Amino acid sequence: MQYRDLRDFIRGLEQRGELKRIQVPISPVLEMTEVCDRTLRAKGPALLFEKPTGFDIPVLGNLFGTPERVAMGMGAESVSELREIGKLLAFLKEPEPPKGLKDAWSKLPIFKKVVSMAPKVVKDAVCQEVVVEGDDVDLGTLPIQHCWPGDVAPLITWGLTVTRGPNKDRQNLGIYRQQVIGRNKVIMRWLSHRGGALDYREWCEKNPGQPFPVAVALGADPATILGAVTPVPDTLSEYAFAGLLRGNRTELVKCRGSNLQVPATAEIILEGVIHPGEMAPEGPYGDHTGYYNEVDSFPVFTVERITHRQKPIYHSTYTGRPPDEPAILGVALNEVFVPILQKQFPEITDFYLPPEGCSYRMAVVTMKKQYPGHAKRVMLGVWSFLRQFMYTKFVIVTDDDINARDWNDVIWAITTRMDPKRDTVMIDNTPIDYLDFASPVSGLGSKMGLDATHKWPGETTREWGRVIVKDEAVTRRIDELWDQLGID
């Protein structure tokens, strides 16, 4: 089922028993985090806090707190269906030439559907039903969460940031956390390689000293939100991809103060600029690692205008030691990644990002090994093929007889098929998440690959061990006798 906007999604969740309305007053300061954390760990519903303490605007939390709700937001009926979305993205990322006329005709509907999902620009939009400008702008009217005791200030977490570099037709969508530092100012914490930061850098080079337009959408429809965190090919805009997920074109509206286009059905829009050179120290904040991060300087976003729907809903989350929403998103999007990786590396049988590895810091790959050194090729491919994995610190590669999602299997493979010196690959001076305080230099560190595959001639001179396999006939006989044995 597809959802036109966030409210449509809320209704759909409520009909399925996947959303709970909270009538008891709960504070955005620490209390919502506690409630959402307990609910997420219990695999509970999305939460709509209708009476946040001190505010008139309800808060939506734990929206993507289960993989099943992530799948619903992407228009799928089950998590397993996300593999089909991954296959579509794999095809769009590297479309193969048709093998003949019949093949060309079979692929034509896919391209026609992609072309037909170009965003639709509208003149009037519900996200601009109410307009607040100038001195009336006050972020303090929004129930922005203060998530952890050591957090320095309230933090906008689910803001969909819209930017466009100079001479670019395509807008960039990214989700960057934003520290509130005044009634109309937040710190835009984007890393140097992210799309928003690249757009800003190019703008400063081409338009020195000129303010850089930015917009932030809060409470967009689920397909647009999830499109911003999915590995969409560079040839496809996030808005068009959201249209494919939703089954109809994404409606956009031009901002009141710039040429940026924002989701027309979003709940709240922040419009404004970044003045080149205006920076501020950001943090500390508790983040998805389970620790407070160090303080660092990032650009300041000045909010010149807030537009919103009548009676808006504020969409929020928290990040902390897994499990949290980013970890759950990682579990669901894992199914999207598998076909994309298999398109480039057909020998891969499964790919798994353990949620306890902070969503992306460790990957386990199983493969059909075909030659000596094959595992190392796959390791390097994982690190380089998708930008989502440039911060993955550990890649474990093993054979397809191992269940990548079962640590009992994985640890057995590591301890029996690896020699630490021969089978460990170390790569130094590579990009690392700025939030990773374990790296010796901020943003720069090392990576480790573990080859836990059976070794081939050329990789070892010794006779390799054979896996013990039970006798099937004996297993069947004991199955038949088991109840008579009275053991359980």
Swiss-Prot record:
What biological-process GO terms show up in the record?
ubiquinone biosynthetic process
How this chain sits in the membrane, per its record, is:
Peripheral membrane protein
**Positions of the catalytic residues:** 287
* Enzyme Commission code(s) on record: 4.1.1.98
- Compartments reported by the entry: Cell membrane
* SUPFAM superfamilies attached to this UniProt entry: FMN-binding split barrel (SSF50475), UbiD C-terminal domain-like (SSF143968)
Q: Where is it chiefly localized?
A: membrane
Keyword Flavoprotein annotated = yes
Which cofactors does this protein require?
A: prenylated FMN; Mn(2+)
This protein's GO cellular component annotations are:
cytosol; plasma membrane
Q: Which domain of life is it from?
A: Bacteria
State the top-level EC class.
Answer: lyase
| Pfam families named among the record's database cross-references | UbiD, UbiD_C, UbiD_N
Would the keyword Manganese be found if you checked this record's keyword annotation? yes
- Pathway info: Cofactor biosynthesis; ubiquinone biosynthesis
As to how many cofactors bind and how, the note says: Binds 1 prenylated FMN per subunit.
- Per UniProt, prenylated FMN binds at 175-177, 189-191, 194-195
Q: Keywords in UniProt for this one?
A: Cell membrane, Decarboxylase, Flavoprotein, FMN, Lyase, Manganese, Membrane, Metal-binding, Ubiquinone biosynthesis
The Swiss-Prot or TrEMBL record describes its family as follows: Belongs to the UbiD family.
What job does this protein perform?
Catalyzes the decarboxylation of 3-octaprenyl-4-hydroxy benzoate to 2-octaprenylphenol, an intermediate step in ubiquinone biosynthesis.
Q: Which PANTHER family does its entry note?
A: 3-OCTAPRENYL-4-HYDROXYBENZOATE CARBOXY-LYASE-RELATED (PTHR30108), FERULIC ACID DECARBOXYLASE 1 (PTHR30108:SF17)
Subunit record text = Homohexamer.
Its protein name is 3-octaprenyl-4-hydroxybenzoate carboxy-lyase
Which organism's genome codes for this protein?
Pseudomonas putida (strain ATCC 47054 / DSM 6125 / CFBP 8728 / NCIMB 11950 / KT2440)
Q: What is the lineage of its organism?
A: Bacteria, Pseudomonadati, Pseudomonadota, Gammaproteobacteria, Pseudomonadales
